[in-house]
Each structure stands twice: as C-alpha cells, then as structure tokens.
A protein has these predicted regions:
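Single conserved hydrophobic/aromatic residue that forms the stacking wall/gate
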Residues: 1-5, 9
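Active-site clefts of carbohydrate-active enzymes
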Residues: 10-17
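Short conserved micro-motifs at the rims of enzyme active sites and ligand-binding pockets
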Residues: 19-24, 44, 282-283
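Catalytic cores of enzyme domains
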Residues: 28-29
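Conserved, mostly hydrophobic/aromatic
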Residues: 32
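Short, compositionally stereotyped local motifs that mark structural "simplifiers"
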Residues: 42, 46-194, 207, 211, ...
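Aromatic, loop-rich ligand-recognition surfaces of beta-strand-rich domains
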Residues: 177-237, 252-300
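Solvent-exposed serine/threonine-rich low-complexity stretches and specific carbohydrate-binding patches
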Residues: 237-248
Length: 300
C-alpha cells in the first residue's frame, strides 16, 4: 500500500499572480488547515462536521491576527439543467450548517427571503439571486443567475456529451472558463452537436458564445458551419464562418459572440466546429492544441 510508504504531504503555492501579501494570505488560508487535516488526521478520525468546528475555531484566530482569508466555503454552487422544456435549478453549499436564501426577481436576498429546500423548475426569464445565511447573517457572496430565454433554451441536444447541455440552460458563462457554464471537449479538431427544437420554426439568427483565454490556450474555432433539417435525416448548410489565425490567437481573456444569419426554417439545428489546431510558435503555449469552449447556443 503506497499510503504506508508515504513520508509526508506537500502543498504548493505559486505567486506569479499575487501582487501583495494579502493576496497570498487569501490563497493560503484556510486551505492550509485542510492540508494539515489530510496530513495529520488518521482516516478513522476524519469527519466533515468535526473539521468544520475546528476550522471555525481556526478562522477565529485568523480574524484576531488580522489575516485575510478566503470565505469561499460559504459560497453557493449552482446547476441549471435543461429538462424537456423547462430548466431545473439546483443550489448547494459545502457547509451543511448554513441556510440558502434566494429571490427570483433580481432583488438582494436577505435572511427573510425564500428558504431553499429543494431544486425547482423555471420556465420563464428571471434573475435568481442567492446567498448563505447563519443566525441571520449573510456568510458568503451573493450568487447571481440571470436566466435568459431563446428558441434553444431547455431544448433537447441529440446524441451529445452531457456537458453540452450547458449550452441550452439559459445561463451565460463568466470570464472563468472553469465556472461549469462552459462546454469543452477532449478532442477539438472537429466538434458537432445537434439541437431538436421540437417543431419546425423559422429561424432568423444563431449566436455562439465563445471565450478567449490566451494563457490557457482557449480560442475560437477556425471554422463554424450551421446545418438545418426537418427530419434529422437530410441536412442542408445555411451558414458558415471562417476565421484567420490573427483573429483566433489573440492575447487576453474575453468573451466573444459569433453571429450567423439563418433566415430559414427547420426543426433540427446542427453546429459543426473545427478547432484552430496547434497554437503557433509565438504563442505562450506553442504546439499545444487550442481548446474550444462554448457557453450558450442562442437562436432567435
């Protein structure tokens, strides 16, 4: 058993993105307590509730010492899932000792707002705001979920990777491509996904939301094609777009939309993405395959 031969545990902290001591403290604490828990506590004694009680005692000492630490353990994780015409909203926090309060009209949640008890269905555009509370005090950051609605929202993706369902859940991604709202793929040379609108409709426009993260090698595809069908058998191409390397491998982190004029009628919409290939030699990640990330498929 390798665990019996393990002599120690080590955690690493890279500071190239830190500009002052407070930022280092924020990234170290209270994560360092979790490292110590993993290193010094025998498996038989590991218990989440016991650890939280000890952690609260530890952060109390950090408060007295004026140390800046992350309070992300009080933040809310969300999942908005298409469910055949509606969206299922699920909220959770890793701490079981807090209440989740939420609103659906865009107002700031308070200790008297609706108590989250179970996931619920959404069928209209709305702005959901939620936060954790303990003894009437807000503990974490407010989570804002603006749910938008278009012809693609909550519709069924055919023969798709489950991660692609985020493209029709009405929630846009942030500048953090790991925020669970960006669909990404293991292979990026050719990506295809098909949406069932459930009936033939006249389609004016399709928009694809993409993110550019130069440091991580995430870029727009070099070519996009949009195809339509009435029976999911024969498809015809209605729009396409080609991008040159200068337009693809741009520096910075930003979100960019790729619009396509359709002006056609169909039930099934197929989008084919062709990845940009390897990052050029002048790139910060030369030779690495460029990744494609899409947050939303918008059809008007």
């Amino acid at each position: 058993d390798r665990r019996q031969r393990q002599m120690c545990i080590r955690d690493s902290m890279w500071t190239e993105v830190c500009n002052k001591p407070e930022e280092v403290e924020y990234l170290i604490f209270p994560r360092l307590a979790a490292v110590a828990e993993g290193a010094w506590t025998f498996p038989v004694y590991k218990d989440w509730d016991r650890f939280l009680a000890a952690l609260d005692n530890f952060t109390g000492h950090l408060d007295v010492k004026g140390i800046t630490y992350a309070r992300s353990m009080y933040n809310i994780q969300h999942k908005v899932t298409p469910m055949d015409g509606s969206l299922q909203v699920e909220l959770e926090c890793i701490r079981p000792d807090v209440e989740i309060r939420y609103t659906t009209n865009g107002s700031q949640p308070t200790a008297k707002s609706s108590l989250y008890e179970r996931k619920w269905q959404v069928t209209t555009p709305q702005i959901i705001k939620s936060a954790t509370f303990k003894n009437g005090k807000q503990m974490g950051q407010t989570l804002t979920l603006p749910i938008q609605w278009n012809k693609a929202t909550a519709k069924r993706m055919l023969r798709s990777n489950p991660v692609e369902r985020v493209m029709v859940n009405g929630v846009r991604g942030s500048l953090k491509y790991t925020d669970s709202e960006w669909a990404s793929w293991t292979r990026n040379d050719s990506i295809a996904f098909t949406l069932d609108l459930r009936k033939r409709e006249h389609l004016n426009k399709l928009v694809l939301g993409c993110i550019n993260n130069y440091g991580m090698g995430v870029h727009k595809p070099k070519r996009v094609e949009v195809w339509l069908s009435n029976e999911d058998i024969e498809y015809w191409k209605v729009a396409s777009k080609e991008l040159d390397p200068e337009e693809i491998f741009r520096e910075g982190t930003f979100i960019e939309e790729l619009p396509f004029n359709l002006d056609d009628t169909g039930r099934y919409v197929r989008v084919i993405l062709f990845g940009a290939g390897e990052c050029p030699l002048t790139h910060v990640r030369p030779g690495q395959e460029a990744r494609v990330c899409v947050d939303e498929l918008i059809i008007e």
